[in-house]
A protein has these predicted regions:
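Acidic/His-rich, divalent-metal-binding segments that scaffold phosphate/diphosphate chemistry
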Residues: 61-198, 202-215
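Residue-level signal for pocket-adjacent positions within structured domains
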Residues: 12, 22, 31, 37, ...
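Short Gly/charged-rich anion-binding patches and loops
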Residues: 45, 145, 247
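Alpha-helical scaffolding flanking metal-ion-dependent phosphate/phosphodiester catalytic sites
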Residues: 142, 163-176, 192-206, 210-293, ...
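Short alpha-helical linear motifs
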Residues: 129-132, 183-192, 243-247, 299-302, ...
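Terminal helices and disordered tails flanking the catalytic cores of nucleotide-processing hydrolases
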Residues: 2-108, 231, 239, 266-404
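Short hydrophobic/aromatic segments of transmembrane alpha-helices and their interfaces
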Residues: 30, 157, 242-243
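Short, flexible segments with low predicted structural confidence
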Residues: 18-23, 106, 113-114, 121, ...
């Protein structure tokens, strides 16, 4: 990992944990109960517990490193991810045993309840993945993303169930993929690696046909999984997907790829959300522009307080997020301590955002201390309020034009 882009938080495998290390992230029980809070000092019993939980490793802080800021919603996001992963493991164990997947509807409804009707953007924080837990974490993250996107596109509950179920189960074939391939980045996969992945995904969905009559949403979800897995091999499909399924495939494809590109992985470094959105937008034939734009309405790409790399060669901090065009917020340029409104053509010609600085666990790096130096200033407060009001008017005007 390129250290200059990240803060000091370190990932340590459970085998290498030592008493006295401080946790950078909380550890939850499978039912969501907090076991160890952030900044907790690890003890020998705690290390044994971490190993018994099946954790690949944990994030620890440097000796003098402060605890990174996290909102209540961010903490709940991590808590729910933990709960969902354990519930998904239970579902996949039942599938492996060819037993009825009783917990599946509850898991799906829980995800949709929390993320399928949001009226605001969220911080899509990622967990570091290994070949051992990639399948579970990727499935959960993809299900959360498709739930948010489908909600913005006004899909009904049954359609959301179909999408979320497909997101959770389409990739169970990854369990058949060798570790050395799973640890690779998508841009380093050989042709033979991709063939192995394709064959594994096809093999994974084969046994799911036995659940067609178990749940009313499952036949449609299975058809979506097949349409997605065989998208590049339509000759293998018994029935071509209808228009609705084709639309769902587009949603699943964007969510799937965005998550894989931005997730931290032991084997390869992720790209930033900005880079991921650029890559998706550049391939409009494969990634639907409307879906990509809708994704940007669901999650923060360039949020307030984020540290940013600028085209001028220095860094800046986002003061006011632009909810209409995330690449054109109001920023504080640290090189000259001046405010620039990138929604202004004059300012945008001078400065553009190149990328975002990230933490080791792929969070947006938030420079709260630097912000504190400027926010109390009355002039800056007035300017920031002015820019926020201006951006809000632009946003409202564009929404009105879209509605017409």
């Amino acid at each position: 990992i390129r250290r200059e882009r990240y803060l000091n938080m370190n990932f340590v495998r459970t085998d290498h944990l030592k008493a006295g290390m401080r946790l950078a992230k909380p550890i939850y029980h499978k039912n969501g109960v907090l076991l160890y809070d952030r900044n907790s000092v690890l003890t020998e019993p705690g290390i044994i517990s971490a190993r018994n939980f099946g954790l690949v490793g944990v994030y620890v802080l440097e000796p003098a490193e402060p605890v990174p800021p996290l909102s209540r919603e961010d903490l709940e996001f991590e808590q729910l991810q933990t709960v969902y992963i354990f519930q998904l493991r239970e579902c996949l164990d039942l599938i492996a045993k060819r037993k009825r997947i009783e917990p599946l509807p509850k898991l799906l409804n829980n995800i949709i309840q929390h993320y399928g009707a949001l009226d605001h953007r969220v911080n899509f924080n990622q967990n570091l993945r290994s070949s051992e837990d990639f399948m579970y974490k990727h499935a959960i993250s993809t299900a959360i993303l498709v739930s948010m996107i489908s909600s913005r596109l006004h899909y009904d509950h049954q359609q959301q169930l179909t999408l979320a179920a497909a997101a959770l189960l389409y990739d169970i074939g990854y369990s058949h993929v060798p570790k050395n391939i799973l640890d690779k980045g998508s841009d380093t996969l050989s042709t033979s690696d991709r063939e192995v992945l394709q064959h594994a995904l096809e093999r994974g969905i084969e046994p799911l046909g036995m659940y067609r009559s178990d749940f009313d949403f499952f036949p449609r979800a299975l058809a979506l999984m097949q349409a997605y897995v065989y998208a590049d091999y339509p000759e293998k499909l018994a029935i071509m997907p209808d228009e609705e399924l084709q639309g769902m495939v587009k949603i699943l494809r964007v969510a799937d790829q965005f998550d894989q590109m931005t997730a931290m992985n032991i084997g390869h470094e992720p790209v930033s959300e900005i880079s991921a959105m650029k890559l998706l937008s550049a391939d409009a034939t494969r990634y639907d522009k409307q879906i990509v734009a809708t994704l940007a309405e669901c999650i923060h790409i360039v949020p307030q307080a984020a540290n940013i790399d600028l085209s001028t060669g220095d860094k800046g901090i986002v003061l006011v997020e632009n909810t209409t065009n995330y690449m054109r917020p109001v920023i504080l340029r640290l090189g000259d301590n001046k405010i620039y409104d990138l929604s202004s053509e004059a300012d945008f010609r001078k400065i553009q955002i190149l990328d975002i600085m990230k933490t080791m666990d792929n969070r947006i790096s938030v420079d709260e201390e630097t912000l504190k130096q400027f926010v109390p200033d009355e002039k800056l407060k007035e300017l920031t309020a002015h820019f926020r009001e201006r951006l809000q008017k632009i946003h409202e005007r564009e929404n009105t034009q879209t509605a017409q």
